[in-house]
Amino acid sequence: MDNKRKLLKELYMGRPIFQWGYSIALDFHYKEIIIDNETVSFQVSTNLLWNTHGSAFGDSKIYYRDVDCCVLCFGIHNEQSFNNLIYWIKELEANTLVDEKVPFVLIGTKSDIERTEKSISKERIEQWCKNKQKNSINISTLHHRMGY
């Protein structure tokens, strides 16, 4: 099971899950949590968690047209995965029906694998986020080691 699926399962089940079957074409999850005394609703399509590696994803536009937030995951050892982030930001912004800018949360996966000289540095990731924020892209980073 990849880290994106582990993250989603932990959100919905409240604890790490070690096995999860494959998602189907319209596999949606819904959860409400309380943040700062306010109820926040999550509706997540597991379709957006498939490993697309930056390739076109058919008619995925129908899945994110009404989004309020986007979680972008990339492998910290995969340059192409990191470079594809801007593609997905532009894709989402071009195809949402919401009037406001969509906030993004950036998650680097595969932190359980030892870093090499080809790994993307934390400093580079943070600089990338700062540059995007200057361009009015609302990006937050999540520094969390998936310790399963």
Curated annotation (Swiss-Prot):
One of its GO terms (cellular component) is late endosome. SMART domains: RAB (SM00175). Gene3D superfamilies: P-loop containing nucleotide triphosphate hydrolases. SUPFAM superfamilies: P-loop containing nucleoside triphosphate hydrolases (SSF52540). GTP binds at residues 51-55, 109-112. PROSITE patterns: RAB. GO terms for biological process: phagosome-lysosome fusion. Keywords: GTP-binding, Nucleotide-binding. InterPro entries: P-loop_NTPase, Small_GTPase. Belongs to the small GTPase superfamily. Rab family. This is Ras-related protein RabK3. It comes from Dictyostelium discoideum (Social amoeba).
